[in-house]
């Protein structure tokens, strides 16, 4: 237990990174996390820092999560810029960020997208940003990932046929 499970944490443009141990499934539980202001980052990384492969997953569980107005959250499972793979919430040897309590208030999903929360990765010189959903048993998961919601894609560079309930990228 690296951090007391009931310790409240307030982020004001800050970050939390949980590195799992190599060769083993790792877990950590934190108390109530409040996103007070600014751009915040929470990462759960399987394997040792600097490792390009992971054996074992890393599950970071938040007792609850609250987001104040003017605060946002980037959830990631990689902190290495040379790995272009957003595997957050995937089954297997990857990072997961879970919330014990329900996502309420301004974090309550709208069309299955969690407002104010996104996932990003660095991919060959460009930043790729995805909307995020919450999947029971997997936690935060970027849209478009296997087993998650998909983006509406009619083909080409158009929004033809999109409705107010479609998620368009």
Predicted features by range, described:
Residues 1-169:
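Beta-strand repeat architectures
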């Amino acid at each position: 237990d690296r951090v007391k499970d009931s310790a409240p944490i307030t982020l004001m443009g800050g970050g939390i990174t949980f590195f799992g141990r190599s060769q083993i499934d790792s877990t950590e539980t934190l108390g109530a996390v409040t996103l007070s202001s600014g751009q915040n980052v929470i990462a759960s990384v399987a394997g040792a820092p600097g490792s390009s492969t992971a054996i074992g997953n890393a599950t970071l569980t938040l007792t609850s999560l609250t987001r104040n107005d003017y605060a946002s959250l980037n959830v990631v499972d990689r902190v290495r810029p040379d790995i272009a793979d957003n595997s957050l919430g995937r089954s297997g040897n990857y990072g997961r960020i879970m919330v014990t309590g329900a996502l309420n208030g301004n974090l309550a999903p709208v069309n299955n997208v969690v407002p104010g929360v996104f996932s990003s990765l660095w991919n060959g010189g460009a930043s790729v940003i995805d909307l995020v959903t919450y999947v029971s048993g997997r936690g935060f998961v970027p849209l478009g990932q296997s087993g998650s919601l998909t983006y509406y894609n009619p083909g080409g560079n158009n929004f033809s046929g999109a409705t107010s309930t479609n998620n368009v990228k």
